[in-house]
Amino acid sequence: VTSADTTTEQFPVRVFGGPTALFEYGGLRLLTDPTFDAPGDYYESGQRILTKTAPPSGSSADLGRIDVVLLSHDEHPDNLDNSGRVLLADVPLTLTTPEGGRRLGNRAKGLADWESIELDRPGGGRITVTGVPAIHGPGAREDVEPITGQVVGFVLTGEGLPTVYVSGDNASLDAVKEIAERFEPVDTAILFAGAPRFPGVLFDGALIVLDSVQAAEAAEILGTRRVVPVHYDSWAHFTEGRNELVAAFTTAGLVDRLDLGDER
């Protein structure tokens, strides 16, 4: 096996439901947006805002060591729930938005767009995690962020390692194009999908994260070898699921790139 070949070896990604996925990269164990609560309702100011409809496929006790949490944002329970907040206390480093880093305190670091941090690998060497744009709704960031808040995506790179993109709650293909210009080809894209909408509440019911067709388009833009979709099940506000993802990627001729995590 040549060194070039090793960069395309497929590493497993375990998907727990919602936006939560676990993978090992350069010897470090990374977890995206931790959500391990049981099904139930979430309230704000006495109003129900979200409903979780299914339990995770495993518990936080199943995780083993977690070195880094990649947290796209801390303000919404479908990205960081009550059990997820408890978990953060035991994780050495949480990377998140600049505002989230200030809210979460000592073990959290916020990354602005294109800001990078280098992390030591257990066997020597380093990986680089770069914060990348994510817009949690339709339109320009300056119009969206005051309503849905800051969100950050992540790109992971390292010598001899595949490039990995974690989109976070992003609805903008223009943001994906910016990321592709800097980092393509991406080996593995963990794409948040599900076509979440809040008709009559947010943005006239427009998408606040990619739908399935857009996820397939994002895969094409990124030139990615593999897409691991997350954030498409277990919550009532997700309007598209597994079947829509498979259909969209099949229509786009990309279904062979879709990794639904059936073998966990």
Give the location of each predicted region.
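Active-site environment of divalent metal-dependent phosphoester hydrolases
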Residues: 37-39, 74-80, 101-104, 115-118, ...
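Conserved beta-strand hairpin/beta-sheet module of binuclear metal-dependent hydrolase folds
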Residues: 6-59, 147-168, 188
